[in-house]
A protein has these predicted regions:
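N-terminal Rossmann-fold NAD(P) dinucleotide-binding loop
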Residues: 158-159
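Phosphate-binding beta-alpha-beta segment of Rossmann-like dinucleotide-binding domains, i.e.
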Residues: 86, 94-148
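Short beta->alpha connector loops at strand-helix junctions that form conserved
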Residues: 31, 71-72, 88-99, 194
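Glycine-rich Rossmann-fold phosphate-binding loop(s) that bind the pyrophosphate
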Residues: 154-155
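N-terminal glycine-/charge-rich "phosphate-binding" loop or analogous flexible N-terminal tail
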Residues: 1-44, 173
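Rossmann-like adenosine-cofactor binding region
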Residues: 54-59, 173, 177-220
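Rossmann-fold NAD(P)-binding glycine/threonine-rich loop
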Residues: 76-88
Length: 220
C-alpha cells in the first residue's frame, strides 16, 4: 500500500510521529505544493492532506485511491461530490481545535474592545513612565456587559464562543440552519439573519465554507 502525505510541514510541524504509518506500506511525504496534484497521488492508495486542492479530474487519474483524509475540520479543498461518485471515502476531523478556536475568537473580541496589543506596545516604549498624565487614554474600553453578540453557526465552536460571551454578561443571537433547543436560554436565542445583523454589537462567523455561506457577509 502506498500512503501519500501532502502539505507535510503544515500537518506536522515536528511534534507528530508519522513512523507508525511505515508499518502499512510505503509512505511518501511532500513538503511543498504543486498545481498538478495528480502527479503526486496518481498511484496512491491513501492520501492525507490539509490545504492542497484535489478536484474530480485529479481523482480520475488515481485508479488505486481508496481513502482521503483531510487533516482539518473544513474539507472544501476536496471535491467531495466527485470523490463520492468515484467511490472514494473522504474523512475530516470534525472536532479539531474546538476549544482553542472558540478561545481565539474571544481573544480577538477582547483585543477589539481593550486594544491590549496597542497599550502593551506603548508601555514597552516607555510612554507610561514618561507621560505626565495619570494615564494615557487613546482608546476608551468597550464593556461587554449587556452587549449583544451575533453568532452565525452555533455548532461546536459557536457554542464555546456563546458560553464565554454569556459569562461576560452578553446576550447571544444565533443564526443556524440546524437549531438545537437545548442551547436556548434567557441569554441565548435563535433568530433570522436580518434580525441578527440589525441587533448585534459584534458578529462571530463560525460556519463552514460552503457555496451557500460564501460571501454571506458582504457590503449589502
Amino acid at each position: 500500500m502506498k500512503i501519500v502525505i501532502l502539505d507535510h510541514p503544515r500537518e506536522n510541524p515536528g511534534e507528530i510521529d508519522w513512523s507508525r504509518f511505515d508499518e502499512y506500506g510505503e509512505v511518501v511525504r511532500y513538503s511543498d505544493r504543486v498545481e498538478d496534484v495528480a502527479s503526486r497521488i496518481g498511484d496512491a492508495d491513501v492520501v492525507f492532506l490539509n490545504k492542497s486542492k484535489v478536484t474530480k479530474a485529479d481523482l480520475e487519474k488515481c485508479p488505486n485511491l481508496k481513502f482521503i483524509s483531510v487533516i482539518a475540520t473544513g474539507y472544501n479543498t476536496v471535491d467531495v461530490d466527485g470523490a463520492r461518485e468515484l467511490g472514494i471515502p473522504v474523512a475530516n476531523v470534525p472536532s479539531y481545535g474546538t476549544e482553542a478556536i472558540g478561545q481565539h475568537a474571544i481573544a480577538l473580541l477582547l483585543e477589539i474592545t481593550n486594544h491590549i496589543a496597542y497599550h502593551d506596545a506603548e508601555v514597552r516604549r516607555g510612554r507610561k513612565n514618561n507621560d505626565t498624565d495619570w494615564c494615557f487614554w487613546d482608546y476608551s474600553p468597550i464593556e461587554l456587559e449587556n452587549k449583544t453578540m451575533g453568532i452565525i453557526g452555533l455548532g461546536r465552536i459557536g457554542q464555546i464562543t456563546s458560553r464565554v460571551a454569556q459569562a461576560f454578561g452578553m446576550k447571544v443571537l444565533a443564526y443556524d440552519s440546524f437549531q438545537n433547543p437545548a442551547l436556548v436560554n434567557e441569554n441565548c436565542r435563535y433568530t433570522d439573519l436580518d434580525t441578527l445583523l440589525a441587533n448585534s454589537d459584534v458578529i462571530a462567523l463560525h460556519c463552514p465554507l460552503f457555496p451557500e455561506t460564501e460571501n454571506l457577509i458582504n457590503k449589502a
